[in-house]
Design a protein with these regions (language model features):
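An anion/pyrophosphate-binding glycine-rich loop and adjacent beta-alpha core
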Residues: 219, 226-346, 350, 418-424
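Glycine-rich loop(s) and the adjacent beta-strand/alpha-helix scaffold that form part
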Residues: 191-247, 315, 395-418
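Conserved N-terminal glycine-rich FAD pyrophosphate-binding loop of Rossmann-like flavoproteins
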Residues: 35-68, 234-237, 244-248
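Short beta-strand to alpha-helix junction loop
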Residues: 77-87, 125-141, 155, 206-214, ...
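Glycine- and aromatic-enriched mobile tails/lids
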Residues: 1-4, 21, 25-27, 31, ...
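Conserved redox-cofactor binding core of oxidoreductases
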Residues: 98-183, 188, 195, 239-250
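Beta1/beta-strand and adjacent pyrophosphate-binding region of the FAD-binding site
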Residues: 1-14
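Core beta-strand elements of the Rossmann-like FAD/NAD(P) dinucleotide-binding domain
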Residues: 2-4, 182-191, 380
Length: 594
């Protein structure tokens, strides 16, 4: 019996879990990561991971977790996979605990849980404020065990360029580039699982790592893989402003009692500690008394925008609000939030234990991503699977805080075995594919590199990237207007024309970051158009997608998944009905209990 082979692209939580599941099935895995695995963006996840264990006796259940997730996502998520994820979540926590993740515990020794946005229950297990790091390190230890046994081979410092497709449109492997030697190679595989994370670089400044470009998703899209719900971009309400990039201030700060406020008087320039409580506007608590500072992220973000831009109550002219932890005991802050407080203190030079933090919304997450089916994390292209933030399945129009980590782990747990079943069911594996198929793709990618290196143009790729980011951030984040979306798409097409005249400052063939960035830039521009066109088409407001011209949710016309496809060099949009068989849609309100 032939031995199949699986490739996993991406070394974050979803990629590592998929790798573990494939290796457990006895199938060899090649794991590709653009950075060392422990530097994958999952390491930046702070607040925790959701599971309805009900250890605090509040009456929580997996059904309530499921309802909160569908309701929080404004009913746009297909319901059966979300239900399966919520039912699997308690077992995932137990698995991670056995792997050695250092979750916080109560004095009795039980796992501790905190409350996050969009729920009234303490449902979020956490490891201080560095939950992603602890989980990533624990999973990598398991992968390294398989690596020592020869079941896993890592390719760190390699970037994915394209899938290798045979003449019938089936994926037979990947083409990748070594970022040191710039060598382009093809790697045969019976199936490939893509766990390539977020797309923050499309918006220039975001809370994402700089390697989160969406380039892999875009490359697959241009090879025929469908992309779903691209228009749904999560803007986190509490990011730490920065000139170079944004840094996240976790929702856990509010989960532990942090309060968001601004001075009631516009232009009040007094230091925050000198402003009496009666002169502070705790707007989230006033507008949403049931959920307070833990309303879902899209609602909190729009509220902050309203306070700053419409009511003109920013902090002394700055687009910012206060996130106040100064009333919380120092011991509690150091035990539960030390990691994120150190980040704020390091970059802004202010101790948030004694002075309120200045925060403002920033691009954080994409609910949209690669289209996958409801059962196997399989795309529309045979042999290609996806898991984690790069796919669209679990969060609908708005992700609840701490659902991302559980969706990463669950997606990897499903994709791994599904890819093994597919590979074992093939009549002919990748070893039977003619060598010319792989050589053809390798040569195509080599020629693209050579063309970029030879190009004698006048355009700077960094300047094009900054323009793209500025337009996307201004027009395709919190508030969308059709005329602005039309202008943005026209600008993106102009940037694509200018891209044809780029000039690379580095023409060497060793560790050429400029070449890799130029390749990624083209893919980012294509994916930016997918996002913008999806937003332009959707004439309603749902979750993170808000249009003042169409302020209401429109279930009659838009309770549909946007599915983008690449059609001979142009972007075509389809709209599929959403599975609402388990929970009928209802009005989404957070000013009162559900």
């Amino acid at each position: 019996m032939r031995q199949p082979k699986i490739i996993v692209v991406g070394g974050g939580l979803a990629g590592l879990m998929a790798t573990i599941r494939v290796a457990e099935a006895g199938v060899p895995v090649e794991l590709f990561s653009i950075v060392p695995v422990k530097r994958s963006h999952s390491v930046c996840a702070q607040g925790g991971i959701n599971a309805a264990k009900n250890t605090k006796g509040e009456g929580d259940s997996t059904d309530k977790h499921f309802d909160d997730s569908i309701y929080g996502g404004d009913f746009l998520a297909n319901q059966r996979p979300v239900k399966a994820m919520c039912e699997a979540a308690p077992g995932i926590i137990d698995l991670l605990d056995r792997m050695g993740v250092m979750f916080n515990r109560t004095p009795e020794g039980l796992l501790d849980y905190r409350r996050f946005g969009g729920t009234l229950y303490n449902r979020t297990a956490f490891a201080g404020a560095t939950t992603g790091q602890q989980m990533l390190y624990a999973l990598d230890e398991q992968v390294r065990r398989f690596e020592a046994e020869g079941k896993v081979k890592k390719y760190e410092g390699w970037t994915f360029l394209s899938a290798v497709m045979d003449d019938s449109g089936v994926s037979r492997g990947v083409c990748a580039m070594d970022l040191k030697s710039m060598e382009v190679r093809t790697f045969p595989a019976d199936a490939a699982i893509f766990c390539t994370g977020g797309i923050g670089a499309i918006f220039a400044r975001s809370t994402n790592s700089v390697v989160c470009t969406g380039s892999a998703q875009s490359a697959l899209f241009q090879q025929g893989v469908h992309y779903a719900n691209g228009e749904f971009i999560q803007v986190h309400p509490t990011a730490i402003p920065g000139e170079d990039k944004l840094r996240l201030m976790s929702e856990s700060a509010r989960g532990e009692g942090g309060r968001v406020w601004v001075p009631k008087k516009s232009g009040d320039s007094r230091p925050p500690r000198q402003i009496p409580a009666g002169e502070r506007f705790y707007f989230l608590e006033e507008w949403y008394p049931k959920y307070g500072n833990l309303v879902p992220r899209d609602i909190a973000t729009r509220a902050i925008h309203n306070v700053v831009f419409e009511m003109k109550l920013g902090l002394d002219g700055e687009p910012a609000v206060y996130l106040d932890l100064t009333h919380i005991p120092r011991e509690t802050l150091d035990r539960k939030l030390e990691g994120i407080l150190e980040i704020y203190e390091k970059f802004l030079g202010v101790d948030p234990r004694v002075e309120p933090m200045k925060v403002f919304p920033g691009m954080h997450y994409t609910m949209g991503g690669i289209w996958i089916d409801n059962q196997n994390q399989a795309t529309n292209v045979s042999g290609i699977y996806a898991a984690g933030e790069c796919e669209y399945q679990y969060h609908g129009a708005n992700r609840l805080g701490a659902n991302s980590l559980v969706s990463c782990i669950y997606g990897g747990m499903v994709a791994g075995p599904a890819s093994v079943r597919y590979a074992r069911g093939l009549d002919k594996g990748c070893e039977s594919v003619e060598a010319s198929v792989f050589e053809r793709e390798r040569k195509r990618q080599e020629e693209l590199n050579e063309r970029l290196l030879r190009q004698e143009g006048s355009e700077n790729p960094i300047a094009i990237w900054k323009e793209m980011g500025a337009w996307m951030t201004e027009h395709v984040t919190v508030v969308r207007r059709n005329k602005d979306l039309e202008r943005t798409d026209a600008k993106l097409q102009e940037l694509l024309e200018r891209y044809k005249k780029i000039n690379l400052s580095d023409r060497t063939k060793w560790s050429n970051q400029t070449l890799n960035f130029a390749r990624e830039l083209y893919n980012m521009l294509i994916l930016a158009r997918v996002i913008t066109l999806g937003a332009l088409a959707r004439n309603e407001s749902r979750g993170a997608h808000y249009k003042p011209e169409f302020p209401e949710r429109d279930d009659a016309n838009w309770l549909k998944t946007t599915r983008a496809m690449w059609d001979c060099g142009s972007i075509k949009l389809l709209h599929d009905p959403v599975d609402i068989s388990l929970i009928p849609p209802r009005a989404r309100r957070y000013d009162v209990a559900k």
